[in-house]
Design a protein with these regions (language model features):
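Active-site neighborhood of HAD-like aspartate-dependent phosphohydrolases
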Residues: 2-57
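Short, acidic loop-to-helix structural element flanking the phosphoryl-transfer center
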Residues: 9-14, 19, 99-124
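Short alpha-helical
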Residues: 37, 65-68, 105, 112
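Hydrophobic/aromatic residues within well-ordered alpha-helical segments
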Residues: 38, 62-66, 90-94
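Alpha-helical substrate-recognition element adjacent to the catalytic core
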Residues: 45-78
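Metal-dependent phosphoesterase signature
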Residues: 74-115
Length: 125
């Protein structure tokens, strides 16, 4: 799958090869399996504010900003956006709840990929 995508890119761009200088990684869900902690934190904090967001639905908002997640739930229940003060307060609680968890486990294979990148002399960010 990746080989085909690379071949298409090389053909369409006119390049003969790809020479990576560095590799940029996202942490959550790529290097560390932190999404269960995010989902649990969102669920607990929303319930404290009488807002309904299941752990399962929290996964659907992965990658969305905290403010957007709060507003989606708030709009669904109340037909309007949450105030900036409410967003700040709810998101601060969610962050504190998330940070109370132990360090998440590495995603399978993440350490090996980082070691390979280091081995071939590429920077990782």
């Amino acid at each position: 799958m990746f080989q085909e995508a690379i071949a298409r890119y090389l053909q369409s761009s006119g390049h003969s090869q790809i020479q990576l200088k560095s590799v940029l990684f996202d942490m959550d869900g790529v290097l560390f399996n932190s999404m269960p902690y995010h989902a649990d934190a969102w669920h607990k904090v929303m319930e404290r504010h009488d807002l309904h967001l299941s752990r399962e639905e929290a996964y659907l908002h992965e990658g969305r900003t905290g403010a957007a997640t709060i507003n989606i739930v708030y709009q669904r229940q109340y037909g309007k956006d949450a105030t900036p003060e409410m967003i700040k307060s709810i998101y601060a609680e969610k962050s504190a709840e998330f940070n109370s968890n132990p360090e998440p486990e590495r995603m399978p294979g993440a350490w090996e990929v980082l070691q390979k990148i280091k081995e071939i002399g590429r920077a990782h960010v």
